[in-house]
């Protein structure tokens, strides 16, 4: 939000308000949208207590609110990963709301849209699906806690940006690379001879999920121990 005069954020999937309570600290204008009246009442009570009393609470459907929204600097969605029977879902199209049907409206009504998706999702396929018919995926963030991948975040925008960036976070450790170098090709990072006494490096969960092994090898000056190995 650096350089923006009056940035705003809209959380279309408010829930318990945890996400918006953190993001609202960075902006003067924030809106929380949630269908369940009970959760809205909880949000109205909690927001002033945690120093984000400026957050506007809207009790209603997030998708319907998007349709009548003018513009917001930033839109956030954490689509529900449950089907009508309560079963867990992973695919974007199976989550509610379905971002694939809203992506063009989201990017036309915001400078940036952040979508939180299942860490089980194939991010390569997600990029293909989200970019189908348009070019909107700008960043991918893979977030791990204690070496367990917890969140997969996609930054969408109609604002042109090359190349696509991937950010891998594990606790206090962070690594970034461009999509063009996020390949699992091992041809030029294989080390045929392993010297006794050298360190053995195993990438963390976010890096393994990203598959940016070539850029990792270049950045750390290491070689894979075998052609199809992810140990360095």
What are these regions (language model features)?
Residues 16-28:
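Conserved SAM-binding loop of SAM-dependent methyltransferases across substrates and taxa
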Residues 1-4:
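Glycine/alanine-rich phosphate-binding loops at beta-alpha junctions
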Residues 6, 71-72, 110:
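Local beta-strand N-terminus motif with an aromatic residue
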Residues 76, 81-232:
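Class I S-adenosyl-L-methionine
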Residues 33-74:
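S-adenosyl-L-methionine
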């Amino acid at each position: 939000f650096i350089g923006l005069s009056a940035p705003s954020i809209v959380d279309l999937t408010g829930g318990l308000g945890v996400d918006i309570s953190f993001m609202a600290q960075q902006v003067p204008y924030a809106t929380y949208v949630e269908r369940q009246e009970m959760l809205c009442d909880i949000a109205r009570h909690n927001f002033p207590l945690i120093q984000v009393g400026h957050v506007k609470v809207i009790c209603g459907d997030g998708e319907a609110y998007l349709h009548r929204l003018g513009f917001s600097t930033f839109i956030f969605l954490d689509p529900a990963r449950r089907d009508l029977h309560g079963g867990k879902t992973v695919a974007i199209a199976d989550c509610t709301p379905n971002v694939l049907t809203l992506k063009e409206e989201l990017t036309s009504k915001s400078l940036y849209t952040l979508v939180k998706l299942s860490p089980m999702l194939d991010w390569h396929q997600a990029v293909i699906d989200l970019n189908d018919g348009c070019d909107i995926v700008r960043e991918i963030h893979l977030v791990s806690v204690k070496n367990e991948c917890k969140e997969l975040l996609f930054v969408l925008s109609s604002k042109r940006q090359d190349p696509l960036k991937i950010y891998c976070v594990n606790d206090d450790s962070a690594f970034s690379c461009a999509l063009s170098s996020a390949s699992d090709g091992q041809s030029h990072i294989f080390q045929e001879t392993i010297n006794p006494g050298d360190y053995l490096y195993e990438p963390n969960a976010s890096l393994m999920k990203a598959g940016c092994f070539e850029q990792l090898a270049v950045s750390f000056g290491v070689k894979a121990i075998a052609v199809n190995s992810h140990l360095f």
